[in-house]
């Protein structure tokens, strides 16, 4: 529902009307948010119809919308890679393609272990389908013994499927071998790739190779490491 409000605000601020179509999971919330925004717009002297909401969970509505040449100026798909590519492939109206999120969390050797576990758990489990959910966890080798055993148990208790390199597999018999394709995959689900790295430089190189420039995270108590990560990683 926050995307409904964000999208409407951005469109109005840029001088555009907007047609909103949200997912079925948040249909009622989206409908309410859109109605409130339309009412507020009208109160500010903007036509209420400048903000419209498609009140159906039928996917055919999306197919109809992306073929309304002459009526719809541009479509902006927001969501997982599957939705985005389906719109890009099938639309006859112009599309602004949003990026997929292969997002990483790097647990540095100087991280607070308890904090790192909370962050790494939330980043994967809270909302695994969103584009800024973590897809790969990178762990410095010097903190792996303190961090990984408990972290893997936490993931297992929440039915997270773990794919890891050989070093990670030594910590649990429930870790599946990771593939080259896994590193660049946006799972959008309770599945996670895990890698142990020798240094922050290796972590940043991995992110540069497989990341999509979306959302990246470092967990550390080392100010210099945090600054290096912040100013190096896209």
Task: Tell where the protein language model's regions lie, with residue ranges.
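ALDH superfamily catalytic-core signature
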Residues: 5-6, 10-17, 32, 43, ...
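A structured beta-alpha segment of the ubiquitous adenosine-cofactor-binding alpha/beta core
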Residues: 52-69
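Conserved C-terminal structural/oligomerization subdomain of aldehyde/semialdehyde dehydrogenase
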Residues: 179-234
């Amino acid at each position: 529902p926050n995307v409904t409000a964000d999208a409407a605000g951005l469109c109005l601020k840029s001088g555009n009307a907007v047609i909103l179509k949200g997912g079925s999971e948040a249909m009622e919330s989206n409908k309410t948010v859109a109605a409130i925004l339309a009412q507020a717009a009208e109160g500010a002297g903007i036509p209420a119809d400048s903000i419209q909401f498609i009140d159906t969970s039928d996917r055919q509505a999306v197919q109809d919308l992306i073929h309304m040449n002459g009526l719809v100026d541009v479509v902006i798909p927001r969501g997982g890679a599957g939705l985005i590519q389906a719109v890009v492939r099938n639309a006859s109206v112009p599309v602004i393609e949003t990026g997929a999120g292969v997002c990483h969390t790097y647990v540095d050797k100087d991280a607070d272990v308890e904090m790192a576990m909370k962050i790494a758990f939330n980043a994967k489990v809270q909302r695994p389908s969103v584009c800024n959910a973590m897809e790969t966890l990178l762990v410095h080798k010097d903190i792996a013994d303190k961090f990984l055993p408990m972290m893997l148990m936490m993931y297992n208790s929440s039915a997270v499927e773990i794919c890891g390199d050989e070093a990670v597999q030594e910590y649990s018999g429930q870790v599946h071998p990771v593939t080259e394709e896994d590193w660049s995959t946006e799972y959008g689900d309770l599945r996670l790739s895990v890698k142990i790295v020798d240094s922050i430089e290796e972590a940043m190189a991995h992110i540069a190779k497989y990341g999509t420039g979306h959302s990246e995270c470092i967990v550390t108590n080392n100010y210099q490491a945090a600054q290096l990560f912040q100013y190096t990683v896209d």
